[in-house]
Amino acid sequence: MNFGYFCNTTNWNKKSYTQLLEEAREIAIYCDQNNWNSIWFTEHHFNHEGMESCTNPLMMCTDAAARTNQIRLGQACNVITFHNPIRLAEDIATLDQMSKGRVEVGIGRGVYGREAVHMNKEADLKDQALSLIHI
């Protein structure tokens, strides 16, 4: 059995962004040192409710890769409709090389209305982008 930690950086207590990032780092290091299998970072934008503060799971994984040794690094998920698919594929591949093969990839089209206002259009964009990436 594998255990992973879903690190959805939230800010219910109105902490500084620097403090939130430091806490995420500490969680990644703790999980690595205590033999967790993976840590997953999410992508949400615009902080609509005033609490979600994780806008770039690849950057979070890159930071965690530099501070850990064995834990797998996942994105849950990269919102494909916000990214150039070629650039996203290159960024994922670079992170995989930098982390010595520890990357887990999650791709989605967004879940909240502000992330996927036109769900049918977003689904088409997601399908087109995935055909370009072809992971």
Model-derived regions: residue spans:
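Flexible, glycine-rich active-site loops centered on histidine and acidic residues
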Residues: N2-Q19, T81-L132
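Structural motif
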Residues: T42, A76, G106-G108
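Conserved strand-turn element in the central/C-terminal portion of the radical SAM core barrel
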Residues: G74-F82
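Hydrophobic residues within beta-strands of alpha/beta enzymes
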Residues: I39, L73, V103-V105
